[in-house]
Amino acid sequence: MLTKEEKKAIIEEYQLEEGDTGSPEVQVALLTARIKNLTEHLKEHKHDYHSRRGLLKMVGKRKKLLRYLKRKDINRYRDLINRLGIRG
């Protein structure tokens, strides 16, 4: 689970302008942080199937947002996947 401070730091790092919380970049960055946290949780709790389902839903949502961003602006997409260190 992300704390308010962690979430705020991620939003400030990836926002396009002041007060931007809904751009694809911010949404993907927040989902990536949540996915990383949940992945660590699942390494310890291998039989937590409910959380695994939530993880798969988050990965799917991130994939859709990345596909949208790639379609709209390929340069922003490439910049984002490089900054996050994820495969595109």
UniProtKB/Swiss-Prot annotation:
InterPro entries according to UniProt: Ribosomal_uS15 (IPR000589), Ribosomal_uS15_bac-type (IPR005290), uS15_NS1_RNA-bd_sf (IPR009068)
Q: Please provide an example of a Pfam family that matches this protein in its UniProt record.
A: Ribosomal_S15
Q: Which residues form a coiled coil?
A: none
Q: Which SMART domains match?
A: Ribosomal_S15
Swiss-Prot/TrEMBL GO biological process terms: translation
Tell me a GO cellular component: cytosolic small ribosomal subunit
Keywords in UniProt for this one? Ribonucleoprotein, Ribosomal protein, RNA-binding, rRNA-binding
- What is the name of this protein? Small ribosomal subunit protein uS15
**What species is given as this protein's source?**
Halothermothrix orenii (strain H 168 / OCM 544 / DSM 9562)
Organism placement in taxonomy:
Bacteria, Bacillati, Bacillota, Clostridia, Halanaerobiales
Q: Which gene encodes it?
A: rpsO
